[in-house]
Amino acid sequence: MPRSSFQKLKIIYIMEYLLKNSDEDHAVTTSQIIAYLKSHDITAERKTIYSDIDALRDFGLDIIQVSEGNNHGYYVARRDFELPELKLLVDSVQSSKFITHKKTLSLIKKIEKLASIHSAQLLNRQVFVKNLSLIHI
């Protein structure tokens, strides 16, 4: 029987954490994953994290393990959209003449969710289009 009602969701929370917080420049450790799970009232041990990451790999998530000395980390290497593609989408939305400012902000927030939190910061750009006001996100 699960220790908490969320225990069965552990692997989904691990996937969410990896997608949101890791990229090639920002690997996450098993300790960080365990702390994240604990914040959601889910208990986990290192060995179960390793097996859950293997299961996510089997599912098709491209998770890379990196090692620096005694520190081991993981990051999601391949995503549906690469950062330059997301920048292109953001620029296209910002420069569109028929999308309202409110809808532009909403769409950009959704596009940012397709990247890690670190890469999403790089999507905050300014685009100036003739006959449109400056849009800064």
What are these model-derived regions, one by one?
Residues 80-134:
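Bulky hydrophobic/aromatic content
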